[in-house]
UniProtKB/Swiss-Prot annotation:
UniProt keyword terms in alphabetical order: Lyase
Single GO MF annotation: racemase and epimerase activity, acting on amino acids and derivatives
Substrates-to-products reaction catalysed: S,S-dimethyl-beta-propiothetin = acrylate + dimethyl sulfide + H(+)
Key word Lyase present: yes
Cysteine pairings via disulfide bonds: none
Family as reported in the entry's similarity comment: Belongs to the aspartate/glutamate racemases family. ALMA1 subfamily.
Stated role: Mediates cleavage of dimethylsulfoniopropionate (DMSP) into dimethyl sulfide (DMS) and acrylate. DMS is the principal form by which sulfur is transported from oceans to the atmosphere and is a key component of the ocean sulfur cycle.
Name under which the protein is recorded: Dimethylsulfoniopropionate lyase 5
Keyword DNA repair: no
EC number: 4.4.1.3
Assembly: Homotetramer.
């Protein structure tokens, strides 16, 4: 397997399609050079070729493709997320303002801190948040300088690095030095697509989440794939792939995979398969703790926490942190977005307590005039704080916020059980949820994706994917994404959690 894992077909648990942009050199992409007429034509042709293959998302094989993110998303209705850097807004939201993220690049002599911050601001971060991402080049290691990468004649040049212990040690030593220089470092983001083969080594050695081109690709695929844990098995063409992933992940779950902590509001109900609080919604272990006094009504209103609520929330988070194997904390109510800032201040672990955090990924993935549906249990309850929630997710510009449309499910037959704290009949409710979304999409023909804000809506995600044929993001796609950054990669890596690499 080549070290440039992003282009290796064995790096994924799903099918990939490649299209080459003729005449677009690595040096041009690295420098963010303005595309010539012929290069722009070649780029359009490559995008068209991928669309013709029916791909569900488009990414790139070079982190510097971020320079052309805006151009490509105008060329297609398919979500385009060309660089691992598009994960940055999610990371910025998960961690405290004082905490930093290390960004590894091939060569920081031609992609320095200023260039990184400029790109991050362009994709939606504030200057203050962009400065939290600290660039670290590897040009001092043989093979990583821009000139050496540009001179690679074929991927066989890189085939040896996977077995090079010397190279691994040099990379780990560089990260260790960066950690000493930045004690507030909490995660690693690999801008370089040459590096995912070393992600497991970084996770094992540093003990922090590592986000790369593969975590991004897996996340994008999940938004358009039947969920093998609780999905509908509607689309047989993707189900076999999803089940293959499930079999691999079941093997992982029996081993030493990390756990996710779930911060629960003070609200008792019987969760359905697919709900955040339902243990079988995941292929890994979860731990739950209740913030006593932080009720559903309080979360909806989003008022500042009382002293008692703050104490209860912090206590629950502390217990989750202390639980064995927990590597991150989510929440069981989308309205907890109102308290995302509070949660991340209380914890040294990444906090991602609302599905709303994914809104920026949607805004960045599609053309500026394309729109999204946000399904919620009650539209009137979400509306008052909706703009503030979007801003917390780094969707700050009024024109971008206007692309998100609330769709309340309060009148769907049978869904009132959610408000009553009763068991939901998923089979009964599904047709109503689908009909509601289809009608809304028909009224808004520019709708390109759906976000399920409510943590009791993921059971309907597969039915929506099938009916609308567009990506659906929910609390489960978010939790799986963050978990993957701390998990032994089942397709390649160093097997540091003793997981099975046997594909069933």
């Amino acid at each position: 397997m080549p070290a440039q894992a992003v282009v290796g077909t064995n790096s994924y648990l799903f099918r990939t399609v490649h299209a080459e942009v003729k005449g677009l050199r690595y040096l041009d992409v690295r420098a963010g050079k303005e595309l010539s007429v012929s290069q722009k034509k070649a780029l359009k042709e490559a995008v068209k070729e991928l669309d013709a293959e029916g791909v569900v998302a488009i990414t790139g094989d070079c982190g510097s493709f971020v320079h052309y993110q805006t151009a490509v998303r105008r060329m297609t209705k398919t979500p385009a997320v060309l660089s691992p850097l598009l994960q940055a807004p999610l990371l910025a939201t998960m961690y405290m303002k004082e905490e930093t993220i290390l960004v590894l690049t091939n060569d920081s002599s031609d992609y320095d801190q200023a260039a990184l911050e400029s790109n991050l601001v362009e994709i939606g971060l504030s200057q203050e948040d962009a400065a939290r991402f600290v660039i670290q080049g590897l040009q001092h290691i043989e093979g990583f300088s821009t000139s050496e990468v540009a001179d690679m004649s074929d991927e066989r040049t890189w085939a040896m690095v996977d077995t090079s212990e010397r190279l691994r040690l040099e990379i780990m030593s560089t990260i260790e030095a960066a950690k000493k220089a930045n004690p507030s470092l909490r995660a690693i983001l690999l801008e370089s697509t040459l590096l995912p083969s070393f992600s497991d080594s970084m996770r094992q050695t540093r003990g922090v989440p590592v986000f790369d081109a593969i975590t991004l690709a897996d996340y994008l695929a999940a938004a358009s794939t039947d969920n093998p844990r609780f999905g509908s098995n509607i689309d047989a063409s993707v189900w076999s792939s999803a089940m293959e992933r499930a079999n691999v992940m079941d093997e992982l779950s029996q081993r030493a995979t990390p756990a996710i902590g779930i911060l629960r509001i003070d609200y008792s109900y019987p969760p359905a398969p697919g709900d955040v609080d339902y243990p079988g919604s995941y292929y890994y272990r979860t731990v739950q703790e209740v913030a006593a006094g932080l009720t559903f009504e309080a979360a909806q209103e989003g008022r500042p926490l009382t002293a008692q609520q703050r104490e209860a929330m912090e206590g629950a988070i502390r217990r989750l942190e202390a639980a064995k194997g927990v590597v991150g904390i989510t929440g069981d109510c989308g309205f907890l977005m109102n308290y995302q800032v509070d949660a991340r201040r209380m914890s040294h672990l990444p906090c991602f307590i609302s599905a709303m955090m994914q809104c920026h990924m949607l805004a960045a993935s599609f053309a500026a005039d394309e729109e999204f549906l946000v399904l919620t249990a009650n539209g009137k309850s979400l509306a008052p704080k909706f703009g503030e929630m979007l801003s917390l997710a780094h969707v700050t510009r009024p024109e971008d916020q206007a692309r998100f449309h609330i769709l309340g499910c309060e009148d769907v037959d049978g869904f009132d059980a959610v408000a009553k704290g009763e068991a939901v009949d998923v089979a009964r409710v599904t047709p109503g949820i689908v009909a509601l979304a289809k009608a809304a999409a028909a009224r808004r023909p520019k709708v390109r994706a759906v976000l399920l804000e409510c943590t009791e809506l993921p059971p309907y995600a597969d039915a929506l994917r099938h009916a609308l044929r567009i990506p659906v993001l929910d609390a489960i796609t978010l939790v799986d994404f963050v978990h993957s950054a701390s998990t032994d990669n089942p397709a390649f890596g160093v097997d540091f959690q003793k997981s099975s690499k046997v594909f069933v």
